[in-house]
Amino acid sequence: DEAALKRHQRFAGDDDTRLAAVHRVAHANPSVAMATRGGYGLTRLLDRIDWKLLVRSVEHGTRWVGYSDFTALHLGLLAHGGAISWAGPTAMEDLGRPDERGGVDDVTVSCFAEAMSGELEAVGFRTDPGCDGLSLRGTLWGGNLTMVNSMMGTPHFPKVRQGILFLEDVNEHPYRIERALLQLHQAGVLAQQKAIVLGAFTEYRKSPLDRGYNLKSVIAYLRTQVKTPI
C-alpha cells in the first residue's frame, strides 16, 4: 500500500492515514492483506473502522493476516461479522528477514503458503501430559493476551461461546500473564470456552524475587481455578 512506509511518532502514519490505508486495502480486496509489523495504534481506529466493509472483503476472499497488536483487527472482525481472519506472520518482522536473524524458517513459510491456498491439512503442537486425547470442535479465536484483555468490555470484543481460545504474549513477566489470565477467568470468558491453548510467552526478565515462580507456576495455579482444559 502507498502508506506502508509512513511514520508518525510510534505509528505507521497518523490515525487518518492508517484508517484510510485499512479501508483502501478492503476496497482493493486482495487475496492476502498482511500486516507489515505488529499493528501499533490499531486500537485508536477501532471505533472508526468500517467493519461492514472489512467483513465484506473477507466474504469476497481477502485473508487478513497478522499478530501482536493486529489481534485487535481479528477480534473486531469476529465481533462485528463473524468473519474469519488469520493469526500469522508479518511481512517485515517474519517473512522479511532470514531465519538466523529472527525470521521464520522454511517450514513455517511453506505451512503459511498452504494455509493461504487452502491446502494445509493439519498443524501439530506439543501438549502437557494429561492433555492428550482431547477431541474438540469450536471457533478458534484469540491472539495476543494483552490485546485480548484490553478489548474486553468494548463493542469490538467477540462473545464466543464453546470456542477454543488461544493466547500468546511477549515481554510480559509471568505475574502479568497470571493477572491477565485471571481477569479473563473472573470476567467469565475462560469458563465459556471448550479449551484454552497457551502458545509462547517469551522475552521477559526474571526477578530474584520470583523464588521459583515461573510460567509453569502460573499454569498450575490457573488449572486449580478453571475447569476448562488448558
Model region roles, listed by residue range:
Residues 82-149, 153:
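Conserved anion/nucleotide-ligand pocket segment
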Residues 32-43, 47-48:
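N-terminal glycine-rich "phosphate-gripper" loop used for MgATP/nucleotide binding
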Residues 51-76, 84-91, 225, 229:
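Short, acidic/small-residue loops that bind anionic groups at enzyme active sites
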Residues 1-29:
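ATP/NTP phosphate-donor binding region
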Residues 37-40, 172, 201-202:
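Short glycine-rich anion-binding loops that position phosphate/pyrophosphate groups of nucleotides
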Residues 180-230:
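C-terminal active-site/capping subdomain that shapes the small-molecule cofactor and substrate pocket
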Residues 140-184:
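Oxyanion-binding "anion nests"
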Residues 32-34, 65, 164-166, 197:
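Structural motif
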